[in-house]
């Protein structure tokens, strides 16, 4: 099983000071009573933590950036060039902007930005899949990893989020419905309620 296969990794983490407790099937049921009683054992990251609202964290970081004098502009960047005064010229769909320093968060779309200070990077997309189960966050007390299935299920403010499968598919590929169906079927099997 995957727990046996992960023993080297678990030992490495423990050797690095990560507190991990081995737990039995009974202990899993005590910690997470809504899980189907099919797990022979597992591990618990004793000091583990998670966000229940990742969007709120990003909003707070953005606000902190603005409070420190930054400017947040949501626009499509087309070009980025050096100017003779040492500033950067950012060409967008609606206008050109000038700044000493910029942060452009374009992810895989970065390859579509032209300009003299753009280094070509062979970047492709890693598309992640997740399924949300609204109003079901109460079913888990903490994130639960399902190593055999390659998924994590996390309780968030707006429901349970199950994620873990990815693919290299490019920017224009259509979503793979089989991956979404797989995630949903695994979650329904381990959380039958």
PLM regions and their residue ranges:
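Helical element adjacent to the flavin cofactor pocket in flavoenzyme catalytic cores
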Residues: 8-12, 35-101
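Alpha-helix N-cap/helix-start capping motif
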Residues: 3, 25, 55, 107-108
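Dinucleotide-binding Rossmann-like beta1-alpha1 core, especially the glycine-rich loop
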Residues: 1-25
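Active-site substrate-recognition segment that forms the wall
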Residues: 79-81, 85-87, 96-193
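A conserved beta-strand/loop capping segment in the N-terminal third of enzymes
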Residues: 1-3, 32-37
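A general structural signal for well-ordered alpha-helical segments in protein cores
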Residues: 6, 58, 180-184
């Amino acid at each position: 099983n995957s727990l046996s296969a992960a023993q080297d990794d678990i030992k490495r983490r423990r050797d690095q000071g990560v507190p991990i407790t081995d737990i039995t099937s009974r202990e899993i049921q005590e910690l997470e009573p809504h899980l189907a009683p099919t797990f022979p054992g597992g591990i618990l990251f004793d000091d583990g933590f998670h966000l229940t609202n990742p969007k709120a964290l990003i909003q707070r970081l953005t606000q902190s950036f603005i409070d420190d004098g930054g400017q947040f502009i949501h626009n499509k960047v087309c070009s980025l060039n050096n100017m003779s005064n040492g500033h950067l010229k950012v060409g967008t769909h609606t206008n050109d902007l000038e700044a000493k320093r910029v942060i452009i968060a374009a992810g895989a779309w970065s390859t579509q930005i032209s300009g003299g200070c753009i280094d070509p990077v062979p970047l492709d997309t890693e598309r992640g899949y997740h399924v949300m189960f609204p109003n079901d966050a109460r079913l888990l007390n903490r994130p639960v990893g399902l190593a055999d299935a390659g998924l994590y299920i996390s309780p968030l403010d707006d429901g349970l989020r199950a994620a873990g499968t990815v693919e290299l598919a490019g920017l224009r590929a259509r979503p793979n419905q089989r991956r979404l169906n797989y995630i949903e079927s695994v979650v329904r099997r381990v959380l039958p309620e």
